[in-house]
Amino acid sequence: MAKISLNLADEAVAIAQLVGVNVDEIKDKSDVRLVLAAQVVTQYALIDEILAEIIVRYFFDIEPDVLHFEKAWKTEKFKIFVHHILDEMVLPKKLSIVRAIGPVPNEVSKIIDRINAVRHGIAHNFFPENRKENRATGEVLYAGADIRSLDRLRQFKDDADTAYRYLHDRLYGPARRAD
């Protein structure tokens, strides 16, 4: 299939549609930056949350069919663990603990590390292209290319989905996934 070059406006619309934003509301490039940041942070949060769930279920021996941890939330031990340990733990440390519990494929670990890196740059900087790792190219790199392009954002979403599906299947089994 031939690659079609999109102009900035067409690419902005395609990115917005890819992440489910009403394109009639986008007014300029800064709006696209906000959409992109929202998508990156959302995917990061989903992965962070499922890593946390794997850790909680391991340490508190909670079966996969128990939802929302209602019984566990009634205990002080669980509340302290979640609020003072898990909530303050960064994603790479959560991944490290999950890897200690059981192996995580290298490709999934690499995806999670890339997602963490790009989320860090976008969430902590108004101009992530000026960070030292991006300054030479002026791009916000994800897997070696600018995540602000439609193709790279597609790869980011596919990668995030791959990581999430692996973690979900590890936790609940593939039969419980709602595709």
Predicted features, each with a name:
Residues 1-99, 103-117, 121-135, 151-179:
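Amphipathic alpha-helical interface elements
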Residues 138-139:
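Conserved C-terminal helix/linker of AAA+ ATPases
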Residues 144-150:
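Internal interaction segment
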